[in-house]
Amino acid sequence: MGSNLSPQLCLMPFILGLLSGGVTTTPWSLARPQGSCSLEGVEIKGGSFRLLQEGQALEYVCPSGFYPYPVQTRTCRSTGSWSTLKTQDQKTVRKAECRAIHCPRPHDFENGEYWPRSPYYNVSDEISFHCYDGYTLRGSANRTCQVNGRWSGQTAICDNGAGYCSNPGIPIGTRKVGSQYRLEDSVTYHCSRGLTLRGSQRRTCQEGGSWSGTEPSCQDSFMYDTPQEVAEAFLSSLTETIEGVDAEDGHGPGEQQKRKIVLDPSGSMNIYLVLDGSDSIGASNFTGAKKCLVNLIEKVASYGVKPRYGLVTYATYPKIWVKVSDPDSSNADWVTKQLNEINYEDHKLKSGTNTKKALQAVYSMMSWPDDVPPEGWNRTRHVIILMTDGLHNMGGDPITVIDEIRDLLYIGKDHKNPREDYLDVYVFGVGPLVNQVNINALASKKDNEQHVFKVKDMENLEDVFYQMIDESQSLSLCGMVWEHRKGTDYHKQPWQAKISVIRPSKGHESCMGAVVSEYFVLTAAHCFTVDDKEHSIKVSVGGEKRDLEIEVVLFHPNYNINGKKEAGIPEFYDYDVALIKLKNKLKYGQTIRPICLPCTEGTTRALRLPPTTTCQQQKEELLPAQDIKALFVSEEEKKLTRKEVYIKNGDKKGSCERDAQYAPGYDKVKDISEVVTPRFLCTGGVSPYADPNTCRGDSGGPLIVHKRSRFIQVGVISWGVVDVCKNQKRQKQVPAHARDFHINLFQVLPWLKEKLQDEDLGFL
């Protein structure tokens, strides 16, 4: 850096149904029920409780590894007493207690043995399976009892291949009736008293050797799906649906392709989001679910996917906010706007729970007038995301509408072509009050897929959302981040690189940079001198402590910090950009990902622009002639933070650039364009807002435009007029002429394109 100036070293869609199971929590010590039920004597030994539904119900809460016995929830009855504590065999218990979670034992295991045998298994206990001679083991040979009361792995099955269909197995905890696996033979499953069956109770051997329905399991009330389980199961199922759509267009998507498919806007896939807004949900949970859906739609769109959306909320009556037939129903921005305008109070006056009516609204969007099906109706796949606690209290059984929808779409009528792939109904429930029987009845049941989910709380559902959208096949997409509450600095800024140059007897230089490909980091040229050796340059990414080996530093050929000394300009920062080439290829992950560069195919997709978009059109989108909201990343007290600034690219541009004369060494420059060339972008000042300024260690870092949930680098931080961090701390009060200047990447594109030509960035 210069000595006088202050250069600043600085699918496929993934859809999620989000809904609370009617939980409005209140610490028991702070509130009493609004009803007449006393809190005296309701305590649980070894745990605590919290009130739900404004005190009309309560939930017992136990430490991890324990469950509430004999029940998880109690309701306040009209008699003024809490519901009785009864065991699964209807015996009355005087006081609730927390008991250790056990995993169920296998009731039966066909054609093999398991060990050890026990009436129950504690958390972390293991069980092993092996088959008799002549039988082959499918599934997991070893399984571990998990903290949620479920076994790890897959159902162990011993099969000799003699049946037309393979042995469907006996999931641990279930009982199976039927041992013949010929074509059209059926088996049925049952659970012990007090447990709820999830999945298919009856499965039939179908033509082709597959079983109808989905594998069953027996659920206790305290059991929840973990975020990881939900993310993996839902993503796997939905990806199958997307790949089916793509295959009909003659494509065979690879792992990378299937997340870049732009579906036919005429309706290759319709997605119906159905949100329960009834009284049992509560305003805060409704708002939280709505916010998550907004983020979800944004994320789906950020992958370049364009399904048509239908959007329904309901209580006593449904309200259709978006129809799949609306001209803009595949426009994520428009759909998001409609969702943002929905209020929980829209259903306040009639707040029953009529799930049947809501599904009838979906049916009306699927159906066609005059019973004349439109062209291509039989190629459109339909995905319903139903967000409900399953506690419908009016309107009748909603499963009848699912049957009508199946009939409309001609599903299950022809055994040779059952068309099951053309309808997927996913049901999500959150919290302890979910009716597991009802939500299981509504969900689709497909072999090797899961369509019904129950998670513990909204926080867990948020985890599901982030785990699903951030799976490994999207890691190479530029400008993506993991904006999760548990995310580290580098989850939220995965492109950020820290650069240090060690100079013997001269100390060290600190800079920032941005990962732009698997081999390159983009930074400022002034961070280095001609005497710096590669071994003295340290680069770290992803918050890792190890330094990356450097192969070479590539400077822009027109950069020359001493280029105008004879003209009385001590330091000249035009073309202040450099690329650091790494010796070894970066391994992308959640904390190491590339930022988007202008005029690349990746940025076209990120901005959701047509494939024919030109570089000039990208520039107009990212850098219009006005004040442009942008950000940079700074390190304060060893923590990365985003700083919001405005690029002055409109009527304030001239005054911003003129303030460069206040920089040390530039006070005698008569023509400011001698130092502020067309290659610079200007931020800082107090209008339209007081912008934060960069510090010395920020130099070389990216100036970023955040648009449509993606981050696009438009500049490289170069130099500033005022050193606002003289005493290792950013000053709060700075003069209005405190400006920062950044190299405009649109102005150095030929050089970037030349040096990054082998990085598969798809420059336009």
Swiss-Prot record:
This is Complement factor B. Residues 35-100, 101-160, 163-220 form the Sushi domain. Belongs to the peptidase S1 family. GO terms for molecular function: serine-type endopeptidase activity. It is an enzyme of class 3 (hydrolase). Precursor of the catalytic component of the C3 and C5 convertase complexes of the alternative pathway of the complement system, a cascade of proteins that leads to phagocytosis and breakdown of pathogens and signaling that strengthens the adaptive immune system. The alternative complement pathway acts as an amplification loop that enhances other complement pathways (classical, lectin and GZMK) by promoting formation of additional C3 and C5 convertases. CFB is cleaved and activated by CFD to generate Ba and Bb chains; Bb chain constituting the catalytic component of the C3 and C5 convertases. It comes from Gorilla gorilla gorilla. One of its GO terms (cellular component) is extracellular region. The unliganded VWA domain has an inactive 'locked' conformation whereby the scissile Arg-259|Lys-260 bond is protected from proteolytic activation. GO terms for biological process: complement activation; complement activation, alternative pathway; proteolysis; response to bacterium. SMART domains: CCP (SM00032), Tryp_SPc (SM00020), VWA (SM00327). InterPro entries: Compl_C2_B, Peptidase_S1_PA, Peptidase_S1A, Sushi/SCR/CCP_sf, Sushi_SCR_CCP_dom, Trypsin_dom, TRYPSIN_HIS, TRYPSIN_SER. Residues 477-757 form the Peptidase S1 domain. Residues 1-25 form the signal peptide. Pfam families: Sushi, Trypsin, VWA. Its EC number is 3.4.21.47. The keyword NAD does not apply. Disulfide bonds join C37-C76, C62-C98, C103-C145, C131-C158, C165-C205, C191-C218, C478-C596, C511-C527, C599-C615, C656-C682, C695-C725. It comes from the Eukaryota. Glycans are attached at N122, N142, N285, N378. Monomer. Interacts with complement C3b; this interaction is dependent on the presence of Mg(2+). The gene is CFB. Mg(2+) binds at S278, S280, T353. Keywords: Cleavage on pair of basic residues, Complement alternate pathway, Disulfide bond, Glycoprotein, Hydrolase, Immunity, Innate immunity, Magnesium, Metal-binding, Protease, Repeat, Secreted, Serine protease, Signal, Sushi, Zymogen.
